[in-house]
Amino acid sequence: MPSARLQQQFIRLWQCCEGKSQDTTLNELAALLSCSRRHMRTLLNTMQDRGWLTWEAEVGRGKRSRLTFLYTGLALQQQRAEDLLEQDRIDQLVQLVGDKATVRQMLVSHLGRSFRQGRHILRVLYYRPLRNLLPGSALRRSETHIARQIFSSLTRINEENGELEADIAHHWQQISPLHWRFFLRPGVHFHHGRELEMDDVIASLKRINTLPLYSHITDIVSPTPWTLDIHLTQPDRWLPLLLGQVPAMILPCEWETLSNFASHPIGTGPYAVIRNSTNQLKIQAFDDFFGYRALIDEVNVWVLPEIADEPAGGLMLKGPQGEKKEIESRLEEGCYYLLFDSRTHRGANQQVRDWVSYVLSPTNLVYFAEEQYQQLWFPAYGLLPRWHHARTIKSEKPAGLESLTLTFYQDHSEHRVIAGIMQQILASHQVTLEIKEISYDQWHEGEIESDIWLNSANFTLPLDFSLFAHLCEVPLLQHCIPIDWQADAARWRNGEMNLANWCQQLVASKAMVPLIHHWLIIQGQRSMRGLRMNTLGWFDFKSAWFAPPDP
């Protein structure tokens, strides 16, 4: 019998007997474990060989045998739990231990660096599963970061300085305002072993043609081997950066036929997905990666939903006891914000917008927040920390305003905290706030209506590119804000848009109301090198490494 199964049987037997040695019979024990008398005898003999108990059998009708426990079920359970932790079997660990507080304590004690069989392993604790990693779909902040570790694109954007770099394409040139040419590397391999072909690249770029920022791509052809020509309907100075975004990452052309591709995707990036469940995401360095091989061999993201109720202060990479910690922090490039829905009567009413933005001002929200959140929140007066576009102007409550509807996407604890503060403030003004939580996909598509939406945005470098690109990619915003998005996109592509003025107009009309900038924090280990926090609150796994202990 496998060791894990035998351990489970012993723990069950120990629990049924309340850990007490006793006189009993094979029949009674077999009934406790719901097995045959013969199998029970085999179990007892095997457990005795392991030194867990002694079984002194007595022969004869009515005779009772002596069962003596030499090992406690708790000790064996702890040993089994340690084995499961080392094997990263978090789903089985949860089933074994049951108690969530105990599971959490065990997980936290094993966070950070691990060195096993010559491999460097990094363990991170996160509050929710990362089940959808499909480029081009609605991806949240953390999924966006993970996708960048799994996939490659024609170009890539340096997370630290926002500069454009080569990726699958080693060079590119603009032939004319409507014609770009990219030169691709040969010998690039997917995680499942197949070599990248030009058909994969063409199919990947054609599949995103329905997205607003890629809709001006009219034709994609390969005139010669490893050469790609892209033709446009309008000039686009940002095209090389667009092709480095997550939606434009390269998938195998057969991706739709591969099982569970969204949760177990296959790319050409530095890490390959090994496991992705509700309890754990495990990615492993790809030895055949065409760039520099990742220095951390394996990254395990352990999922513990219970930490969602704590202030989202960032990632904790706790190391061994006594090891000094390094803390890196930055104010996010983005903010939580209110979005008024012009499709509803109250959302479109300028008096309602003025009054709500006055009573739910950033300073009011921070003032009514608990201290643990006040330490992480900074009042926002623009979409970026450096902008001061919003002005708090006293406004009178509109006559007849008795209720409002606020909607946000689920699995985000701070949304609930902020919404609760808003509900409290509005109630003091005799206005009922009805709160709705929907899925992220529903939020992203924005097909349902709500007076107000509570959203958050994190913009990546370079900001003059990503800010408009991010807002334009969210259908919800286009439903709620009745401006000419296509005309604005054309001006943006031509470099004719003053982005600060454009955002200031959105804030001045109260279409968007900035609320809070959040401090992003990584609590790392002193032995970890190359850890540079990006604007998504994560760091590039492939560039980080562990320094050996001091001699």
From Swiss-Prot:
CDD domains: PBP2_SgrR_like
HAMAP family membership: HTH_type_SgrR
InterPro entries recorded: SBP_5, SBP_5_dom, SgrR_HTH_N, Tscrpt_reg_SgrR
Organism of provenance: Shigella flexneri
One Gene Ontology MF term: DNA binding
Source domain of life: Bacteria
Protein name, as recorded: HTH-type transcriptional regulator SgrR
Physiological role: Activates the small RNA gene sgrS under glucose-phosphate stress conditions as well as yfdZ. Represses its own transcription under both stress and non-stress conditions. Might act as a sensor of the intracellular accumulation of phosphoglucose by binding these molecules in its C-terminal solute-binding domain.
UniProt signal peptide: none
DNA-binding region: 26-49
KW RNA-binding (keyword) present: no
Region (Solute-binding): 163-492
Domain HTH marR-type, chain residue ranges per copy: 1-116
